């Protein structure tokens, strides 16, 4: 274990917390030592406190960890803490941890809108972590203690949406109009109450509370440039990009599918083949940094007319890769395509772990 960074997980008994634990088990750079949950779980061995619902077995390395309350005093030894807390509780707890000088990577929505809190999809906008670097450098220059910080993981469906947009914008310039219709897996709703089986079997639910709004504004923050002083990010304006989302829950276990149409600002627009080549050639910065979990192929361009499909394609690059298919011209905008991403890996806990790997590679933890 020598040389590993000490990690903790908040909300360890929940759906996202369990996924964090799976991804951190036997990780080459992080040692999971502290687990936080509610007061009714505190004091118990993790194996006795959790109702384990992952398809993979509970890692032995986590079974005997004694669960702590979600208070910073129990996490002082941690170099990084991953938060899988529900938004109802995350705000106050994560703020207390940050004020105690602890680094937090959060899956909750509470601080995503804050201009000085990076909202990160690690295969898309790791440069926004310069906000953290600037904060640490400023404190050091002023002779102050090392500050804590919060980094937010994006909404699960936003992660899949922005992944192909980043290389296209870098290559062909701004996208000024974008529509997406999602087909989202039931795992995105978490455990009980989640989505009742009687509601989703033989059915599609054309509503996910708050999801469409999150996709529309998060896209405008993730794709926005850093401020010149690297202290914050402002959302792109409606004049710069218009985003419209419609979100549906479908009877799929894992993997969010999105039907996207987009328009480039610059004329003439690229060709279909140029778009495909751009996506195939994209290499994310996390891979260039040598991060353990980074996908070797960030975007998999599929030529089969009936792909991507969740069951067949969600686990590409261990769930960190994004699959894109059916790329073709759109008679209303410029192009349309189908995008698939693993909602609990690159769309949630896996994104958090890859963010931490980038922080480590940049000596920010």
From Swiss-Prot:
One of the record's GO cellular component terms: cytosol
Family: Belongs to the aspartate-semialdehyde dehydrogenase family.
Keyword terms of this UniProt record: Amino-acid biosynthesis, Cytoplasm, Methionine biosynthesis, NADP, Nucleus, Oxidoreductase, Phosphoprotein, Threonine biosynthesis
Alphabetized PANTHER family for the sequence: ASPARTATE-SEMIALDEHYDE DEHYDROGENASE (PTHR46718:SF1)
Function recorded in the entry: Catalyzes the NADPH-dependent formation of L-aspartate 4-semialdehyde (L-ASA) by the reductive dephosphorylation of 4-phospho-L-aspartate. Mediates the second step in the biosynthesis of amino acids that derive from aspartate (the aspartate family of amino acids), including methioinine and threonine, the latter of which is a precursor to isoleucine.
Annotated positions of the Phosphoserine modification: 318, 323
One Pfam match: Semialdhyde_dh
Modified residues (Phosphothreonine): 13
Pathway(s) of this molecule: Amino-acid biosynthesis; L-methionine biosynthesis via de novo pathway; L-homoserine from L-aspartate: step 2/3; Amino-acid biosynthesis; L-threonine biosynthesis; L-threonine from L-aspartate: step 2/5
Binding partners and assembly: Homotetramer.
Keyword Signal: no
SUPFAM superfamilies: Glyceraldehyde-3-phosphate dehydrogenase-like, C-terminal domain, NAD(P)-binding Rossmann-fold domains
Species in which this protein is naturally found: Saccharomyces cerevisiae (strain ATCC 204508 / S288c) (Baker's yeast)
InterPro entries tied to this protein: ASADH-related (IPR051823), Asp-semialdehyde_DH_CS (IPR000319), Asp_semi-ald_DH_pep-lack (IPR005676), Asp_semialdehyde_DH (IPR012080), NAD(P)-bd_dom_sf (IPR036291), Semialdehyde_DH_NAD-bd (IPR000534), Semialdhyde_DH_dimer_dom (IPR012280)
Subcellular localization: Cytoplasm, Cytosol; Nucleus
Other facts noted in the record for this chain: Present with 18400 molecules/cell in log phase SD medium.
EC number: 1.2.1.11
Protein name, per record: Aspartate-semialdehyde dehydrogenase
Designated gene of the protein: HOM2
Catalytic activity, reaction form: L-aspartate 4-semialdehyde + phosphate + NADP(+) = 4-phospho-L-aspartate + NADPH + H(+)
């Amino acid at each position: 274990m020598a040389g590993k960074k000490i990690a903790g997980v908040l909300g360890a008994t929940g759906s996202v917390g369990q996924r964090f634990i799976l991804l951190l088990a036997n990780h080459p750079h992080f040692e999971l030592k502290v687990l936080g949950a509610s007061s009714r779980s505190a004091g118990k061995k993790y194996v006795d406190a959790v109702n384990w619902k992952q398809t993979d077995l509970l890692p032995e390395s986590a079974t005997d960890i004694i669960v702590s309350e979600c208070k910073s005093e129990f996490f002082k030894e941690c170099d990084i803490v991953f938060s899988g807390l529900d938004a109802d509780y995350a705000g106050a707890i994560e703020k207390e941890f940050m004020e105690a000088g602890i680094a937090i990577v959060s899956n909750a929505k509470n601080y995503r809108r804050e201009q000085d809190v990076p909202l990160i999809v690690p295969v898309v906008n790791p440069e926004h972590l310069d906000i953290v670097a600037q904060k640490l450098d400023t404190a050091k220059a002023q002779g102050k203690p090392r500050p804590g910080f919060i980094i937010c993981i994006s909404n699960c469906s936003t992660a899949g949406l922005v992944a192909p947009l980043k290389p296209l914008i870098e290559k062909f310039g701004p996208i000024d109009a974008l529509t997406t219709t999602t087909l989202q897996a039931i795992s995105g709703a978490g455990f009980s109450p989640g989505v009742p089986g009687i509601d989703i079997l033989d059915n599609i639910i054309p509503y996910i509370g708050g999801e469409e709004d999150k996709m529309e504004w998060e896209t405008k923050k993730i794709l926005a440039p850093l401020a010149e002083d690297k202290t914050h990010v402002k959302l792109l304006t409606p004049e710069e990009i218009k985003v419209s989302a419609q979100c549906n829950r479908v009877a799929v276990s894992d993997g969010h599918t999105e039907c996207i149409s987009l328009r480039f600002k610059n004329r003439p627009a690229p060709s279909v083949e140029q778009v495909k080549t751009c996506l195939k050639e994209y290499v994310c910065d996390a891979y260039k940094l040598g991060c353990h979990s980074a996908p070797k192929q960030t975007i998999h361009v599929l030529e089969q007319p009936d792909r991507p499909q969740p069951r067949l394609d969600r686990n590409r690059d261990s769930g960190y890769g994004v699959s894109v298919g059916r790329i073709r011209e759109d008679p209303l905008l410029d192009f349309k395509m189908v995008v698939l991403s693993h909602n609990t890996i690159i769309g949630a806990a896996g994104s958090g772990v890859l963010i931490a790997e980038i922080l480590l590679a940049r000596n920010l933890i």
